[in-house]
Amino acid sequence: CIRDSAHTWLDETVYKNNIPSNELEKWFKVEQERFSELVLRLFHTELEAVYEEFNRGQDNDGRLMNYELMDALFPTHPNGQQTTIGKSEHLKNPSMVAIHKYFNEYYVPNNYALVLVGDLDFDKTILLAQKYFGNFKPKALPKKSQIVEKPMDKIVKRVVKSPSAPRLQMAWRTDSYGTKEARMAELVAQILSTNNNDAGLLDLNLNQKQKVLRAMAYVLPFKQYGYLALSAVPKENQSLDEAKNLLLEQIDLVKKGEFPDWMLTAIINDMKKDRLKGWETADGLSSSLYNTYIRERSWEQELEDIQEYEKITKADIVKFANDFFKDNYAIIYKEKGDNDKLIRVENPGITPIELNREAQSPFLKSILNEKVEEIKPVFVDYQKEIKTDNINGVKLSFIQNKKNNLAQMNYIFPFGTDNNKELSVAFTLFNYLGTDKYSPEEMEKEFFKLGINHNIRVDKDRINITLSGLEEDLAKGAELFDHWLRNVKADENIYKTVVNTILESREVAKKDKKNIMAALTSYARYGKNSRFRDVVSKERLLSAKAEDFVSMAKNIVNAPYEVFFYGKDLEKFKKNLSPIIKKSNAKYDLPAAKIYAEPSTDGKVYFTNYDMVQVEMSKVGRGETVDLKDFGKSSVFNEYFGSGLSSIVFQEIREARSLAYSAYVNYSRSGEKGKHDYVINYIGTQANKLGQAVEAMNGLMANLPQIPAQFDNAKNSSLKQIASQRLTKQNIYFNYLATQKLGFNHDIRKDVYAEIQNLDLAKLTNFYNQKIKPISYNTAIIGKKENLDMAAISKMGEFVEVSLEEIFGY
């Protein structure tokens, strides 16, 4: 199994496996065994892991806001009265008898579906399903009376507090998925906030004009009921009520019908395109299939759903909005402050389990010994798959889309923020500007009318401009973008607002736990001279003029670039794009790329204080420079020792000793020739268990554990992952670009596969002893200082407390 996971949500529990097609019958055998009888192994250690998950949720203010929102919208229905993880009292006295009863009542064949998507022989697969699941006996399901909520007739206000920046969320209860009201709500949400372009009313009137830091609308439909939500992050010195009023003003525009007549057609076309794109992947198609089952709908109904949307008129939307949007919503204010509703579940203190990793049951032996026809890996011949051509002297790379009418083109520029860090500001500003022909709002509307998505990504060494949509519209989209780039107009007022937004966003980032941890880990890895800290200064932003950055964006039309096209008809693309794609004869002054050093990691412990229930620790150690000859060994090391449910770290730290909810060790390979690899060691746990968890991790890493059977499984899993992986579509081209950065022009998976085939535990141990064991680490820790065992932390190395200003660089 390449990937094994599961999730639980309001109406579903879904187990997900990604398996090679040649292992399908083995998978059926294992799943037959797993779902035929419940065996609660590792129960008390896994229970403590659930305590950890509950406590991690206390540090996630998005989750806390959602709990309050659901409770307010659904005061009697399980949607709002029963969270997925449960309440603290549910976790304190769990009953194994009740768990068995639940399994026996609900894990019955008339209450679940098998959803299989991929390289399948359908007739054989159906026979396998019958063979292994056909003898499961259906049972009458427990009867549940349908709970009907009373209509909401007032505004329900709730407050959540945490250290992060303020924001708000407001929502109206809707009817269930598949109903006319749910469809109406979906269309209104997209009129307010379009999925793929910034052409909705919130996008244009609030985000584009920067009246708030961020605003959006969305619909979340359930099997019974659902909701339409609007959210906003206010600007500095803007109250939550002011942001709320701005959101309500946009709803009033919908009520008045003040949105373009063409918008519904554009939204529905966008929905069709999203459906095509989603069904191109196994994950996307399988999700659609299992959601159809959960919602008790037929696949025919799902396919015909778009036709139901097409029947809805603008007049229908206006009437719906006036009937639907009343003072009957829930609103959650997320204020900055101490969480006064904090609930901590204390760990009971458990006895660690001794895992016998060498033991194999007769069933496991039979599965492992069963021979299957081997899947042969398919490696890409880039020169064969990527056709090269040119348009007016500009290099053109082409991969044919043989599936549908979706197309994509990319302008690739071989430089980025390492050459000029101000490029990121230039293109941030660019997105808010218009031309002599189109205002900023009109520009977004034109792209949306065409059904063309546009995106500009500025990386450290590359600028990638992407245009995507239906192939028949791509040339018009390229023409529009070319007009925008060549004719963009500087606007001093918009620039000042963009600067304020950038500076306010930086302050918001300094209040967010994830951003703080990312900044602290970067500081532990690189020190002060890092890309993370090297941002355009506040002084430069305030003293510069709009034209300084606009000219920078416009000037890239004179820079060297190449084009990638993914679609059906190359010759038609060349003909249509010939007037647009041209090689400039003008000189383009490109500054040399700045070099960011990768200093040695020498044993320091960097700490930043943050008010949270748990503590997070990330140790980063600089290894040797990247070497293709080690790719196979590092892959197997991660699989065997450090990452995933079958790794030694997960089994020992979480399953056997329950010292952390999340723990892993990852050998992170550099993607660039001449740069260093890093080893990352992460633990997320309760503050009082950090010392024990670190001690256990250090014990595991002192010497690579020698477990031959587990090594064989990890090796075989790594081989099967490569053998069953298929690089397709646009991925071939971008994988090729990544391979070139390492200094190669061939599919390096071939080298990795051959290396793993010849790998044994002795060779992996030698790699560990030479490349990993000698590494010294810097440590990043975030948590509430008063909760930490400073004596345990002081043993990790030289302790340095760093401020937010030090780690962020502003």
Predicted regions and their residues:
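Proteolytic maturation boundary segments
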Residues: 123-159, 199, 204, 276, ...
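Peptidyl-prolyl cis-trans isomerase
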Residues: 40-42, 94, 312, 487-496, ...
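A common structural junction motif
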Residues: 33-40, 133-140, 248-259, 483-490, ...
